[in-house]
Amino acid sequence: MDGLGPHGETIMDYSIYDAIRSGFGKVVFVIRKDFEDDFRSKILSKYQGHIPVEVVFQSTDALPKGFSCPEGRTKPWGTNHAVLMGKDAIKEPFAVINADDFYGRNTFEVMAAELSRPRDRKGDYCMVAFYVGNTMSEGGTVSRGVCHEKNGFLDTVVERTDIGYAADGTIEFTDENGNKQKLAPETPVSMNMWGFTTDYFDYSEKAFVEFLKENIDKPKAEYFIPSVVNQMINSGLATVRVLKTSSKWFGVTYANDRPVVVAKFAELHASGEYPEKMF
């Protein structure tokens, strides 16, 4: 956890601070078991008295009955496997985020408002989409899940790689045929901020079994959130409302992103968006 703020704050510190002031009431961390002692002493302790926290563990051998991790597999099973690890700790509507992405206050506010809405059916989910122009790295190209939507609901997420600035300042990516294609700056993309209700765990467990049947012996295969969401949408089992945010994403994708991020956090503190001491 790299300290990037003026007083050594991590990106996760900002996310948790924004979540608290947006109305979230608990944080569940998904970590490796061998990281537990350091995590509890160096990271968790600072949140004490600010918000309830729980820790769950992701490991390669956390598999359904009838499956065992192939010898030599070291790669985690993916983002949706990490979500599944939280099943016993989560009993209410919840948001999923990456610990190393800065999402911004507005993102948590729109997510909290949507998750607070009464629901009368299963599969009523949401996600926050960023404008791709607000997610670029000055250090190089990025990969993003481009969101295709209909009437405000997600139709599909298509992973696009090699997204960067062209010589004329426009945004482009490399398609599956190796050709450069333009992306409008306001194109919505997923930064892995999803909003689910607990029925998502039930479908995910069943889908994980099917994933393992096909991929158990593939050492690099991963069980990703967008894959499961796409399955549920295509099967008519879920709708995913696409929420928009005015926030600008940033993170340390490349080493030369770090000074840029440090400067941005300094500006946010100087402007009063964040207090001198958050925790």
Where do the language-model regions lie?
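A structural signal for short hydrophobic beta-strand segments in well-ordered beta-sheet cores
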Residues: 1, 146-149, 242
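N-terminal glycine-rich phosphate-binding loop and ensuing alpha1 helix
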Residues: 1-44, 51-53, 92
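Hydrophobic packing residues within well-ordered alpha-helices of enzyme cores
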Residues: 39-43, 111, 204, 261
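Short phosphate-binding loop-to-helix
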Residues: 47-93
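Short beta-strand-to-loop acidic/aromatic patch adjacent to the donor-nucleotide binding site
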Residues: 92-102
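Conserved core of the sugar-phosphate nucleotidyltransferase
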Residues: 105-194, 198
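A C-terminal functional module that forms or caps the active site or interfaces directly
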Residues: 205-238
